[in-house]
Amino acid sequence: MPEDVQNRTRIKSERYESGVIPYAKMGYWDADYKLKDTDILALFRITPQPGVDPVEAAAAVAGESSTATWTVVWTDLLTACDIYRAKAYRVDPVPGTSDQFFAYIAYECDLFEEGSLANLTASIIGNVFGFKAVKALRLEDMRIPYAYLKTFQGPATGVVVERERLDKFGRPFLGATVKPKLGLSGKNYGRVVYEGLTGGLDFLKDDENINSQPFMRWKERFLYCMEGVNRAAAATGEVKGSYLNITAATVEQMYERAEYAHAIGSVIVMIDLVIGYTAIQSMAIWARKAEVILHLHRAGNSTYARQKNHGINFRVICKWMRMCGVDHIHAGTVVGKLEGDPLMVKGFYNSLLLTHLKINLAEGLFFDMDWASLRKCVPVASGGIHCGQMHQLLYYLGDDVVLQFGGGTIGHPDGIQSGATANRVALESMVLARNEGRDYVGEGPDILRRAASTCGPLKAALDLWKDITFDYTSTDTPDFVEVATGSR
């Protein structure tokens, strides 16, 4: 028998007689691994159990999220196991911690079904988060290669086409969520939509938990909403819309509601993140065929995205949802009532809007990534914002965003229409100041007060909400060490 064959036989014999061996020695750790352009890369924050070596913990995550089980198996010999094993290739300590590590893992692209987020996530987050070798585990970022991205459709509409359809350019979109979320009759619900749109908003929307309850069935809501939309469009001469939430118990029911919304003229429908990845992709495919904008509410995301040491960072959800094909996703406000560190939110927005991502540790972006011409997904800022913050919102979030003022419209002391007008005037005055080259951030309060001198609804809103803000320390902030650089 040739010597090389004897050597391979000896190695395999030792491997498969060993029963249980460390993951790092099973082939799931390779510090010299050469990355391929087609590799799917994942960055995990790992908190190993006491006594577990960080490299072994990283190898365990690589193994359990790809091909490994708790013992060696002979059937590995029937596969190209050396290729299909995920490879942990780098482990770095997390700055400012003593027990957390960033583990970089590469996956062969052929491990995943084309165009299936459900299959991708079944491996990456499917089983490994319950693994005993790690005390806590968080998926911080991913690089999806060009070749794999090309198997996904991306956003059904995209920001450019949405602006063309709605004839709205040079400023953020304006919207509001109908309040109260639950309990209104269909007729009163439609009245809220009409008044908000007539006052100057582009969109009204359902909230995440309004579906088809005893106090208002879905078809009743859809009809009254569209009556409000059509009347407001006729009165203002502008294209208007209302996000009709088609979320339901089954995908079949969702298709029924989507088709009905389309039939009665809605330009946009809405779904919730909690319906699951397969349902989201299914509705995105429908939306593209029907030429309907698809809005996604991130309902439920904070159950796994908010805690710093365990779960999934929201930037990963942003990437996945852009792949799935949604046109809008709630992505933070910075200044509102919901979690949102400014740098982290910037990273979320860039993941949704840029055509090519560069490594930016301050924004939590750990990989370069080309979006393979997938359309842009519009971020939505919603939750505890009002017109007095307009200069901050424009500065932090830019133009390609939907600013949604729910309480900040419907809570206006003079009514819904006045609340909408206050927001529209505040936005247009701030955009004008920016376009004139003024320091709209520093002069923001003065710009708003000057605009309010000729707009009663804006003055009433500023007097009511003044400088209300939700100033809490974010639980999720970037982990990086600033390094001074000198000029040459």
UniProtKB/Swiss-Prot annotation:
Question: What reaction is this protein's catalytic activity?
Answer: 2 (2R)-3-phosphoglycerate + 2 H(+) = D-ribulose 1,5-bisphosphate + CO2 + H2O; D-ribulose 1,5-bisphosphate + O2 = 2-phosphoglycolate + (2R)-3-phosphoglycerate + 2 H(+)
- EC code(s) of this entry: 4.1.1.39
Q: Which UniProt keywords apply?
A: Calvin cycle, Carbon dioxide fixation, Chloroplast, Lyase, Magnesium, Metal-binding, Monooxygenase, Oxidoreductase, Photorespiration, Photosynthesis, Plastid
Cellular component terms (Gene Ontology): chloroplast
Cofactor dependency: Mg(2+)
Q: Where along the chain is Mg(2+) bound?
A: K205, D207, E208
Q: Which Pfam families match?
A: RuBisCO_large, RuBisCO_large_N
Q: Where is this site: Transition state stabilizer?
A: K337
Q: Carries keyword Amino-acid biosynthesis?
A: no
In the record, which positions carry N6-carboxylysine?
K205
Q: Where is this protein found?
A: Plastid, Chloroplast
Active site annotated at which positions?
Answer: K179, H297
Query: InterPro entries, per this entry?
Result: RuBisCO, RuBisCo_large_chain_AS, RuBisCO_lsu_C, RuBisCO_lsu_C_sf, RuBisCO_lsu_fd_N, RuBisCO_lsu_N_sf, RuBisCO_lsuI
Cofactor binding, per record? Binds 1 Mg(2+) ion per subunit.
One GO BP annotation here? reductive pentose-phosphate cycle
A GO molecular function for this record?
A: monooxygenase activity
Chloroplast recorded as keyword = yes
Per its UniProt entry, what is the enzyme's top EC class, as one word? lyase
Family of the protein in this entry: Belongs to the RuBisCO large chain family. Type I subfamily.
Q: Which NCBIfam families match?
A: PRK04208.1
Subunit details: Heterohexadecamer of 8 large chains and 8 small chains.
Tell me the function of this protein: RuBisCO catalyzes two reactions: the carboxylation of D-ribulose 1,5-bisphosphate, the primary event in carbon dioxide fixation, as well as the oxidative fragmentation of the pentose substrate in the photorespiration process. Both reactions occur simultaneously and in competition at the same active site.
Q: What else is known?
A: The basic functional RuBisCO is composed of a large chain homodimer in a 'head-to-tail' conformation. In form I RuBisCO this homodimer is arranged in a barrel-like tetramer with the small subunits forming a tetrameric 'cap' on each end of the 'barrel'.
**UniProt name for this protein:** Ribulose bisphosphate carboxylase large chain
The gene from which this protein is expressed is rbcL
